Amino acid sequence: MKYLCIHGHFYQPPRENAWLEEIEIQDSAFPFHDWNSRISAECYSPNALARVLDGNKDLIDLASNYARISFNFGPTLLSWMEKREPEVYQAVLEADRVSRGRFGGHGGAIAQAYNHMILPLANARDKVTQVKWGIRDFEKRFGRRPEALWLAETACNTETLEVLADEGMKFVILAPGQCKRVRKIGEEKWQEVGAGVDPKRAYLCNLPSGKQIALFFYDGPISQGIAFSDTLSSGEKFASRLLSTYNSGEEAQLMNIATDGETYGHHQKFAEMALAYCLKKVEETPDVELTVYGEFLAKHPPVYEAQIVENSSWSCFHGVERWRADCGCNSGMKPGWNQKWRGPLRSALDGVRDEMIKTFESVGAQYFKNPWDARNDYIDLILDRSLDAQHKFFLKHATEKAWNDRPTALMLLEMQRNAMLMYTSCGWFFDEISGIETVQIMQYAARAIELNRVITGVDLEPGFMEALALAPSNLKDLKNGAAVYERYVKPQAMPIEKIALEHVVSLLADETVNPKKAYECEVLAYEPKKLTAPGFHLSYGDITLKSVTTLLERRMHFAVFQRGAAEFLCAAGAEGTMDKNAVFAKLEELFAAGKYDECASFIRQAFEKNYPLVSMFQDVRRKVVDLVLRKMDEETDKKFTEVFEAQYPVVRGLQLIGAPVPKPFLTAAEFVLTADLKAEFRAADVDVNAVEELMEDVKTLGLDVSKGPVRDAVTEKLTLLAFAFARNPSDKACALKLVEFLNYADIFGFEPDTVKAQEFVFFGLKALGEDAKKKDILRALARKLKIAL
């Protein structure tokens, strides 16, 4: 029998600020908030509902690719997805449930080492915790025990395999170059095969402990071709390439490939459609069966055994040197650069990690019955910060001292969590120590160092920076890792005073902000007083925050002084650092007297911490900018409308005698007509006559408003109409309204994005079955949205 298994490794490096657990706006991901959001739209979401097209490029099916392949998602990525893309997250979980029914009880999903640490380079305890956390995270999300765990970069050694076997993992997926030699079970002679290993079978690996684990080696050349050639340019080509690999033998053959999951849609646009078509084609091929590794292993246990190449991986020719040395592996995009910084960076991290181990063992012994057991179980609190979960955790692990001082106990565990996050593999993968991935892992180191300082009073940062100074940058103005840390990491630190002030500014700029939540903190009390004058605003008072992560609680006094639209002075001080009543009275006196410069100077002197707006999280700055722009838009709209209404009759007269239309008027006209069209399409019922009149004006003035905001508004309306149809597909009026809207969109040349509308209508028509083919209006609707009936 012939089998096919396609594995997708879905992972993104963590991008959250180490203090806030939130991702800052990333302009390079525009028009999305950040790269996670962009990649989700391009890959994770489309693969949950992938399109299959016929020869006419009409839609014939929508199916979850996840439900028919083997896959893993990084736990840190799933954590983000659960909060920010809940529909996609649920689709991933549901796909695994569906796949268990398809593949004999074996789900397509497998676990992953928690934060993509290179396990052969990790110390023994980190190996264990990374595997335990990855498994526990999987169990919590998928509701079952995983059969396997994906190793970051497939980096492997015998010690790592022992940890996997200890945790009951049945198999591991490796690159063919990671195979050292094979032999038939029961035979004595080994065959040195290396990368020439036959990838069409499972292999048994006998470990020194006496335990065993199965090995699958993916097809290297085909996997590489899929990732870096045009194989995915069509589903037919993809399927043909995979189906051409089988030989004529009668034994079970497993064609298996493994690539980054982001290949399907992000790295290669529309590749999720090629994957969907390929899977459908394979399902229709009589002698080939889709499978996942767990099912194949159960049906066809290994008859060969294999040994691995120690300290090997899929992305470094030199084993695992890419994550600790200047081995020559890099992106290839910066000829002449070196990676001599990799070794010193790892040494710097190892140095602070070892000091934090001492802290954890000495101080931790006062707070936990067994600190390392507590760390292994800390994943339960990471996944559930509720009071009930904390109570259960403390019942199991806490000493009496921990019960009386929970914040310190939790800070110890958070220190260890960040001390592992700082080894995320992406920090070494690329070319330069100032790259965002490397800055990110330094940020985790900074957070861990800060927690160690709070717990012990000992500051590890000077020694860490001294070690980082030995890590050379390729950029002259940066020189070394210490300069990178100083420039890019330190400004990202978020003391609780700054978190409080950012929350106050957010509330002033955006009424939709949750007043009870400031990033990872609860707002227990917020008692502001506000004073306003033309061009000035002063907000001051008390605020109390409590960290959900560490339970650390802080009451603070604050003042936010605003001059003009976007000039903010923000200051805060812990309770007890000032005579609050005297300070607040002085602020009131100065502001009431119009002594605004003195008011600002007094704030700088009276409060412990001062922060300009420019130092704050970019999302907060954007809230202020958005508020300013909204006010500007309102004023602009009013002025442009006055200009348009007053001058349009004159302009029409000028056109009649062949005179050119003044450019300033055209600017005003485009603004006004765009706003009016948006308003029409966002109304509950579109007034077609009004749209026709507006478009006549657009045509008369030679404007083009078919793109941008108007197109977006048309797309929104189309999607809403399609959703209404999907909820009640037998309602002829819904179908008619949708067809008429599509006709008008064609007439006016709006070209809306039909992706979501097509999905809704497809499922609506599918619910009607054969009846959909019998009604003219439904056939017309299908034609308009290119859906095959």
Predicted regions mapped to residue ranges:
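Short, well-structured secondary-structure segments
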Residues: 3-8, 13-125, 129-130, 147-151, ...
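Acidic, His- and aromatic-enriched active-site or binding-groove loops in soluble protein domains
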Residues: 90-103, 107-108, 132, 144, ...
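Eukaryote-specific, cytoplasm-facing alpha-helical/coiled-coil scaffolding segments in long proteins
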Residues: 442-452, 472-477, 569-571, 699, ...
